[in-house]
Amino acid sequence: MEGSKRDIIENSNNGNNKGVVIEELGETYYTNSKPSTSADCKYFRDSFEFGSNNNNNNNNNNNNNNNNNNNNNNNNNNNNNNNNNNNNEEKSNNETEKTLESNGDTTTTTTTNNNNNNNNNNNNNNNNNNNNNNNNNNNNNNNNNNTNSSNDIYMNSPSSTLSSPGNAGNNLPIGCTKPNVPKSPYSPSPPHLYKSNSTSYLKSSFFSGNGSSSSSSSTTTTNINSNNSNTNTYSTSTNVKKNNSNTNSNTNNNTNGNTNTNSNSNKKNINSNSSDNIIINDTADIMNRRRDRFKSFSWTIGESNSNSKFSELSMISSKCKSIKSEFTPLFETLTVFDESDKIRHSLIQNHYKTLLIQNPASPNRTLLTNLLQRRGHNLTTCPIDINHVLQLLQKESFSLFIFDPNESIINNTSNSISSNEPISLSSSSSYYNNNNSNNNSVNNNNNNNSGNSTNNNSPSSHTPNSPMIFQPIVSNICSNSGGSGNNSPHHIDNNNNSNQQQQQQQQQQQQQQQHQHQQQQQQSSSTTATTNNSCTLNQQQQQQQQQQQQQQQQQQQQQQSQPTTPTQSTQSPTTSISFSKKKNLTINTSFKTSPMSSPKSFNKPSQSPQNIFNNFSNTYNPNNIEFCKILKSKLTEFETVIVLTESTDPSEFCQYIDAGATDYIPQPISPILLDLRLTTCQKLVNNNLHLKKAESLKDATRKMVTCIENSPDCVEIWDPSGHIQYLNLAFSEMTGFARWELLGKEFSNLIDNTEIIPNMWATLTDKKTWNGFIRTRHNNNTLIYFEASISPVLDQFQQILYYNCTKRDVTQKRIDEESKTLEQNKIIEKSRLRLSMMSHDIRTPMSNIIGMADLLLDTSLSQHQHHYLEIIKNSSNTLLTIINDILDISKIEAGKLDIDYESFDFNATVSQVVESMAQRVQSKGLELLSYVDPKIPNILIGPSSRLNQILTNLLGNSLKFTDKGEISICCLLNDETDSEYEIKVDVRDTGIGIKKEALPLLFKAFTQAEGTITRQYGGSGLGLAICKELVHLAFNGEISVESQYGHGSTFTCILKFKKFLPSDSQNLLPASSPLQQQQQQQQHQQQTQFHQHQQQTQFHQHQQQQLQHQQHQQHQQLQQQQQQQQQLQQQLQQHQQHQLQQRQHHQQQLQQQQHHHHQQVHLQQQQQHEHDAQHNQHIQQQQQQQQQQQQQQQQHEHNNNGHHNSHGHNHHGSHHNHNHQHNNNNNNITINKLQHQEKKQKSNEQQLESITENSFSPIVEPMVISDPDTPEALNISQSPSPQSIHNGTTINQQPTSPLNTLGSKFDFSGAKMLFIERNDTSRGNLFKQLLAWNIQLELVEDGESGFRKWKQSIESNSPYSIIIMDLNTPGVDGASLPMRIKKELELMQQHLQQQQEQEQQQQQEQQQSELQKQPDVENKNSSQNNDNNNNNNKSNSSGGNQCIYRSPIIMLMPIQFLNSQLEDNLKDAGVCAILSKPIRMSQLADVFMMYLGPNSEHNNNNNYNNNNGNGYLNGGGGGGGSVNGTGNGTLQVGMSNDGGNGCGVVSFWNKQRRASAEEQEQDPSKLLGKVLVVDDNHINIQILSKMLQTVGCEVDSVLSGADALAKINQSSGDSYDAIFLDIQMPDMDGFQVSRKIREREKKFSLPRVAIIATTANVFKEDQLKCFDAGMDDFISKPIKRAEIKEIIKKYGKNGNHQSGSAYSLYKLS
């Protein structure tokens, strides 16, 4: 219906009114026969496909009486009748096909059957004619009603009218009515109908308005006896559902030959005639049902809009209250999805695969295939073979299975069919249609005449005219595509044949079936399975003729061989149904359908043939049921199985449902019906897929939960706030608490060691995983230790959902570890004691050997003896080094390595290591180079001794495996943080290299790369192992190696040092190593692990205290910062005030100077006027005396060289204007100088102010600021109070930056240097350093190139400020290159002098010639004075331009080449300084400051010459070199020839030599007087005594501590200056002796004596014991001379010894 709702017309009382029953999902509605308009039925046209189908073919049961005398004729007539019937049926079928294909308007198909029977009685007996006719009509009506089991309404009329047979074909419109229909005896449909999720579709049936007749459709049958022919007219009707079935049995018994008995009975056939979707509920409440229920249906059957269907089904389900229990599964399945998950037709594609189980020749194949492909199914087909299906299931999975058992050939193992005989049916009562027929009319014809009887084996029963021969497989080719075959009425004759006859018949039938099967295979190969699978008429006739001929021959043979029995009766022409050996039934090729029956059992004698074929269709086969069961057993509950069936019997449906089918589709298969069912199945499949996923998820969740619950470890889940949400069973077992006791509480209740909570919670809130140990108390108050791992679980937005905590009980493991640790500590203590004893025992004899070797070397020995002693000493030192390495690695492994952190000079430490290794490296002919990044600060905090050890081991390793080339060490600043520096140290060599496979073994103890290396180079293999451990423990760094075999190796260390701060110098104490800290923490935990317990309140208090403490610290820090800022502000204010005062003072000074200058100028002017007056007075006198003194004046002018005095006096008669201008110029120069000094002073003040503002570190180092004008630069020292800056004085202030480096200390801007070096690495390192000092550097590789460069610089008037050359550079050859430069300078000087002499001679000649030409004396005098002045200026200018440039030369040479003879030669060649290689940058900086700095020594004795602005030294003078300011402010150095030596300054090496000579001149006996040596070893006493005697000490010795105390008591008047005391002595050790001495001094108030401990122990504990016992210092054995000298300087008479000085220094370090 469209637009508006349809009103239901009340039921009419007219009994002739007919209506349509419309049902859906168990509810029945009725339509009236008279609608208001034809448009009301538009939903029929819109919702259904139109077509005509002969659903009801009414056949009259004509009882043919055959006489005994006319058996042959009857047989012939039967054959003829069969032929005629076949022809008529073929024609009717053809007509029906045409009607279906066309769009005609007729709905009635008439079929005429002419049965030419000569002896046919059409009217039956006279006494029962009316009854028989009525019965026949009723039978026909029943047949029609029962055979119409369609589920769709087929209409051809465009006017939407249905043809009603009850009105003799009148077209009646359909209206709505509610007739009085008796209550249906049927119960509601079984639950499986709703379980299948089938959609709602219409089922309609006509009914009688008054309810007097149980038939809803009538059939008019006309029997015409004309020329022995019967004409039957059948009228088709719509598909009608019948509740009551009528069974009509006609029996004709006549003693004369014809007896007709007609019986009409109305029976309730419960098990028959029920379509799978035809559901009729109790109709008593039909009148009371709501009308809007029917109107709400949107009539969208067959449409693809699944959303509307879904809404309709949801609406219907809400109103089906009466079938709520049955509809619930479907309702829950369909309503489980929300709006976004609704199933749409376009989205169902490719969601699942479909398996179509069907024989290739099935009539439904094309329809199903096309429909499934159109709906987007991934379709796979296979025959009905369980093995084939199972193979497919193993390969892939399917979600939908469609099983079509029609025309199937399946192995049957059941014994339900025991008879092999064909079943004959009466041809007169036979009919066929396209639907299932469940009413069967059976005629039992019993003839008493035995002579003319015909049994089932007679040829007449198998005549070609029989239309109901069931043959195997043939129907697969010629069946109708519209639906499966239907059951037809069957006539069964009772046979009394013997067993032998039955066996023969079975054999013959088997042969026939095999032959027919072969023919069908040949035909099926040439035909295709289309929607219309019908064969042509010629093919059908040929097949029928062949089959009939074979059957006739077989029957004739049987009749000849076997006589008929008296009980056999003659029959009219029949249709045979044959059961093959395989128990499968098929039909003849002449039929559109294949009526096929499979009775439940033939073994029941009481069951009539009518009941046998009345209940089951041809698709019901026990093998099909078994197949369905087997298929379902191999599937899961989520796969859907649909069965195609021909039956309308609910019992058969139940069989398939019970066998595992989800749904079924009855015949005939309509595209609309199939599409609806597939839509429902697709929904079900989709739901099943969701359910399958849900089930798998549920299973996985169940497994996961089971695993977590039964896990042996504790599993906890916390919410983001830290509250416990879940605990597994293991928690209760381990802790003894019930889970409910702790659920919802904070996790801190489970932690006993609450000190870990802040760090843990900070890690977790930072979204990181925390791993550690948690201590928990058991319910019985015992401690439990857990190894825990807690990780946050994040969502897609990286937000914390919850925390997952996993704990493992490690209590027993922890107890075992603690016991093992205690045992190991005991063992370590014992081994440490043994190691200490062994160290003393080993080092003592080694120290004796080395000491004696040193003493012997000081005696007069031969060359060979001296060589032998050197070998002994070197071997002893090597052995001592190995012993020290063994002790170090033992201490490292024991965790007792001492690491002392102190402030030290990094550059000095590296330089000391390099210098100590230089002689060994250079003795092998190798080059040792070092470079320290200028950015690295001088002062760092770290273990300097361990740095020394690491560098020594690395350099020693490189030296061992390098025979040629070089070894270099490079230190770079890798990174810098707020608190530390990261320095990268690279040690490179050009040795043998290391193979790749040996690199992993390189840093292991007692291992080397190859075994042959140990034999060739020696060594213990401990050096690199110790380096690795020291780098990790002492510097928290890393060490790595890169090597190329045969080309050398590079060892890289990353070391971390702390920054030096002023507070560190006061609070710097020896810090323990990270390993020791870890051990101390472990010991502390071991001591307190069983005694710490805090409650939850304590945890909160602890947190609050921490917060308060943090706030307090922050407040203090803020206060400190504020105080510091205030101090800085105060300092700045003071400094600014001081600057203002200085500026005012400078201004006052400038004003005074200017005032003084003005006064001087005024005085000079007055003097000048006076002088002019006096000059005018004496002009005449001068003119008279001029001629006489001319020669004297020329000589005097030549000597003075035109020099003018500062007061402007001119004794040579210069003009007054000239003198006045000269004075003005001098005044201007003085004023300019003062202004320039003022500007310079202001710039220095601004620079100092910026230094003060930007300084944050109190580290104070001198800084050189180059100044071209002032003779002295600013020198910043450590004093915080500023001083005046006037006249080059120094001030004390903070440095420019907190980073105090060697590069930041010096600035030599403008200096130009020439470096002559052959080694590329050395040139590169020096180039980097000099760039930091702002020096312009030029590099050359040999002496010849260096000489050319130097000469070019001289010629271009841009000489080098300094020259550095290597002694081993080619072309230098020791002193040859400096000597060559010196000679070249001498030649240049001589040439310059000659030029000057020539110029002077020329000037004298010019002057004499000019004097002679003067006319008068006055003019001569004036011109002479002018010429003299000009000549003086020229000579002055020429002398200033021609200078001798002598650059300072610095020579680099290896230490091993240093000797006095070479030094003297280099000095004579003009070398100013000699530096040993490798170069120490601090020494190089000192040399540069000596020759390039503003405070250089030779600058103090030189005068500035600013006449021409170039500032070069005049070569004519005899003064020394000077540093002068050029026009551009650069520094340049000139050096004069000093008496032939060419060096006017004291050289650097002379300073060193003088310092060493001064040290040697000091008397050692004056440093330390009387000394006491206490030792229990005679050899040690001899060695130490001899060393002390060599430095001039008076030595006393004793062998025990008691003797030492006695000796000290005896010498009370003459006390000792120092006591060298051994620690380990038998009777009284050194600690006791030292305490006794200190007690004695305190008791008698004696002066403190220096006590120096001599010990072979190197452990820190022993050293601390020495200081605690009152000792002042210690010396480790073996004792060296250098250490003795240092002790003498420190504690001698002239030393700065104080009480406990060594101990205090040790504490600070």
UniProtKB/Swiss-Prot annotation:
Regions of compositional bias (Basic residues) in chain numbering: 1204-1221
EC number: 2.7.13.3
GO biological process, one term: regulation of protein kinase A signaling
Catalytic activity: ATP + protein L-histidine = ADP + protein N-phospho-L-histidine
Keyword Glycosyltransferase: no
Modified residues (4-aspartylphosphate): D1366, D1622
Matches recorded under PROSITE patterns: HIS_KIN, PAS, RESPONSE_REGULATORY
Domain PAC: 770-822
Record field: compositional bias (Low complexity): 53-87, 106-148, 413-466, 486-535, 554-576, 1075-1112, 1137-1153, 1176-1194, 1390-1412, 1420-1440
Signal peptide range: none
Annotated region described as Disordered, given as residue ranges: 52-192, 206-276, 413-535, 554-615, 1068-1112, 1137-1298, 1390-1440
Keyword Nucleotide-binding: yes
One Pfam family linked to the record: PAS_9
Phosphohistidine PTM sites in chain numbering: H840
GO molecular function (one): ATP binding
Domain notes: Atypical domain architecture: contains 2 receiver domains.
Protein name: Hybrid signal transduction histidine kinase L
Organism per entry: Dictyostelium discoideum
Gene (name only): dhkL
